[in-house]
Every structure is written in structure tokens, then in C-alpha cells.
Curated annotation (Swiss-Prot):
Protein name according to UniProt: Phospho-N-acetylmuramoyl-pentapeptide-transferase
Cofactor(s) required, per the database record: Mg(2+)
Topology versus the membrane: Multi-pass membrane protein
Job of this protein: Catalyzes the initial step of the lipid cycle reactions in the biosynthesis of the cell wall peptidoglycan: transfers peptidoglycan precursor phospho-MurNAc-pentapeptide from UDP-MurNAc-pentapeptide onto the lipid carrier undecaprenyl phosphate, yielding undecaprenyl-pyrophosphoryl-MurNAc-pentapeptide, known as lipid I.
The encoding gene: mraY
Length: 392
């Protein structure tokens, strides 16, 4: 919005030439981060008071850790603060004509809406289950598949008209079409190694990455500050990849596929980092507010969508290794429990408690130890992910 305003002012008179600074992506990225940070810090206390007044407190289930029982009643659904700060800051600072940012915003707010309904049912309607799993996955799948069908052609072409033409051609050809190299699966640490996916393969991969990332972040969000800081670090790192991928010069030098317009995602990533740090101010131990599903599902979906656009799905799995391991710990725990119950008549557990962060708590780690150590691991994983920019 401010970019368009600056361009309009420059057209009116040469005296407004200093507004040329708005043309620089890096300047707008810094301003987006600062704007989201300030919005979050200033609005945070008011949002917390509002959630407290509405009695939107976190319910603690009976099988939870004893040390968590004192958290019962802490305001939840604080993710609305994060999403609000991200949306306002992004809309202010990004190029409104950029399709990729609109897609990420739509996916983020769509998953946020799913999380909001889930939280609302748990907290207000006093339904401990919230949205049923099938219902939640259905709506996640709808958003994921729609986003995938658009992105598969959007990444292949630079104009909306051509995107529609490609979609029609794909249908007329019997759902069979070759995609350009930039739509392939990139393998990190190797020069120009890209596996062609085809339309169906791209859609399936996109669906799995977006929905999987969303749920993985949600499963990680179980301790004060545990999920939000890794989201900030991974999001900021993806912003670097977006900047490189969207630059014809840097992408050619670093042997990355050039995707016109992808660089504008740096604005969204910066806003997400700023909003996340603002939320951490209130979410650090002992937390004054929890993000709830409205925040966790949305942020995870955003990370997955950005990774798809900049073609860094595997790197996302590396940098977001904590999210991956947390999700796998739940799946393995449930699978092993069901298998042993059928085979031996009683369910057995691989971990003392899932997700993994609760296993470490049961093993004697303090909550703050788990959180900070997971942060350190994420920082190292993000550095490894960033080395793929040059080590190829």
C-alpha cells in the first residue's frame, strides 16, 4: 500500500523523490518487521485483557503434566494478535500486485480461521475435543489443494492470464502436462539437481507440505515460547531464500531457479518475524497468553506455503527439524500403542509422553530447559539450511 502511495507521490512532483527508498525491498522488509513488532507490543496488553474478560482461558486436560495444571485459565487464542500484526504490516509494506504474498496471506488467514473455530469450541463451548479431526483435516485439505492448484501454474507463469490458460490446457490434455524446471523438487547441497514432479506430483507435495507443516507447528506448541521462536527463525531464514529466488542476479549466481515476484515474500517473512517476537514478549515463561490453534495452524501453514513458492521443501524439513520430530513422535507413539494393543492386549509406549517435549519433561528436564534447548537446535538447523545457499 505504501509502495503504491510513494510511486503516486513521486509522479506528482520531483520534490517527493526521497520516497524512492520505498522501492528497495530490504528497506520495506525492515520496516515490515518493525511495524509488526510495534503493533504486537502495543496491542498485546489490550488483547490479553480482552481475552481475560471474555474468559477465554486455556483448558488443561486431566492427563497433562502436573507442572502445567497452574496454567489452567491462562488466556488463549492469542494467535489473533500475531495474525493481526502480520496482516496489517504486510498490507502496508508489500507490493499489492504481487500474487505470491496474497496466496500466503490467504492460506495463513484460512488456517487461522480453522484454528479459531477449534479454539472457540474448546474454550467457549467447553468441548474438550474442539473440531473433530476429520472436520479439521477436511478444511485444511480444501485450503491446501486450492492453494496447490493455483501455485503449480502460478510458479510456471508470470501473469494471471497465462495461469488460467495453463489450467485450461491441463484439463484439455487429460490432466497431463510437463512443468518448467523451476516447478521441480530441488535437492539441497547439489548443483542444479531438480526432479520433475508434474502437475499431480506438485499438488500432492504442496498439500503434504502445507497441511503437514501446519499440524507440526500445532503439535510443537505445548510449552511457553516453544513454538513461536522456531517459527521466527525458520520464517526469517525462508525470507533469505525468497530474496535470492526472486532476484534474477542472485538466483543465477547461486544456481537457484528464478521465480519472478518471490522476493516480495521477504516482506511477509519479516512481518512474521516481528509479530512473533512481539508475541514472545508475552508468551515467554511464565506465559501471559497462549497462541492457541488459531496461531499455530496459521503460522505452520504460512511456513509451508512459502517453502513451496521458493522451492525449498526439503530445506524447510531441515530448518524446521524440531517441528518434524515433534510430529513424528506423536505419530510413532500412537501407531506403536495401537499395534501393541492389538498384538499383546495392552498398549505400550515408545516415549514417556508425546509430543517429544513432554517426554523430556517426564525425564526430569525443566520446562525452560526444554524450550531453550529446542531453540538452540533450531538455530543450528537454520544455519545448516542457510549453508545450502552456497554449498551446492
Amino acid at each position: 500500500m505504501l509502495l503504491m502511495l510513494s510511486q503516486w507521490l513521486q509522479g506528482l512532483s520531483p520534490e517527493f523523490g526521497f520516497f524512492r527508498v520505498f522501492q528497495y525491498l530490504t528497506f520495506r522488509a525492515v520496516m515490515a518487521a518493525m511495524t509488526a513488532l510495534l503493533i504486537g507490543l502495543l496491542a498485546g496488553p489490550k488483547v490479553i485483557r480482552m481475552l481475560t474478560a471474555l474468559k477465554i482461558g486455556q483448558p488443561i486436560r486431566g492427563y497433562a503434566m502436573e507442572s502445567h495444571l497452574s496454567k489452567s485459565g491462562t488466556p488463549t487464542m492469542g494467535g489473533v494478535l500475531i495474525l493481526g500484526a502480520i496482516a496489517i504490516s504486510t498490507l502496508l509494506w508489500f507490493d499489492l500486485s504481487n500474487r505470491f504474498v496474497w496466496v500466503v496471506l490467504a492460506v495463513t488467514l484460512g488456517f487461522g480461521a480453522i484454528g479459531w473455530v477449534d479454539d472457540w469450541r474448546k474454550v467457549v463451548r467447553k468441548d474438550p475435543e474442539g473440531m473433530r479431526s476429520r472436520e479439521k483435516y477436511f478444511w485444511q485439505s480444501v485450503i491446501g489443494i486450492v492453494a496447490a492448484l493455483y501455485l503449480v501454474f502460478c510458479i510456471s507463469e508470470n501473469s494471471n492470464a497465462r495461469v488460467f490458460e495453463l489450467f485450461v490446457t491441463w484439463i484439455q490434455s487429460g490432466f497431463s502436462m510437463d512443468l518448467p524446471p523451476q516447478a521441480g523438487l530441488l535437492v539441497p547441497f547439489f548443483k542444479e539437481v531438480s526432479y520433475p514432479l508434474g502437475v499431480l506430483g506438485f499438488v500432492i507435495l504442496t498439500y503434504l507440505v502445507i497441511v503437514g507443516s501446519s499440524n507440526a507447528v500445532n503439535l510443537t506448541d505445548g510449552l511457553d515460547g516453544l513454538a513461536i521462536m522456531p517459527v521466527v527463525m525458520v520464517g526469517a531464514s525462508l525470507g533469505v531464500f525468497a530474496y535470492v529466488t526472486g532476484s534474477a542476479v542472485y538466483s543465477k549466481y547461486l544456481l537457484f531457479p528464478y521465480i519472478a515476484g518471490a522476493g516480495e515474500l521477504l516482506i511477509f517473512c519479516s512481518a512474521m518475524a516481528g509479530a512473533g517476537l512481539a508475541f514472545l514478549w508475552f508468551n515467554t515463561h511464565p506465559a501471559q497468553v497462549f497462541m492457541g490453534d488459531v496461531g499455530a495452524l496459521a503460522l505452520g501453514g504460512a511456513l509451508g506455503t512459502i517453502a513451496i513458492i521458493v522451492r525449498q521443501e526439503i530445506v524447510l524439513a531441515i530448518m524446521g527439524g524440531i517441528f518434524v520430530v515433534e510430529a513424528l513422535s506423536v505419530m510413532l507413539q500412537v501407531t506403536w500403542f495401537k499395534y501393541t494393543k492389538r498384538r499383546y492386549g495392552e498398549g505400550r509406549r515408545l516415549l514417556k509422553m508425546a509430543p517429544l517435549h513432554h517426554h523430556f519433561e517426564k525425564s526430569g528436564w525443566k520446562e525452560t530447559q526444554v524450550v531453550v534447548r529446542f531453540w538452540i537446535i533450531t538455530m543450528l538447523l537454520c544455519l545448516i539450511g542457510l549453508t545450502t545457499l552456497k554449498l551446492r
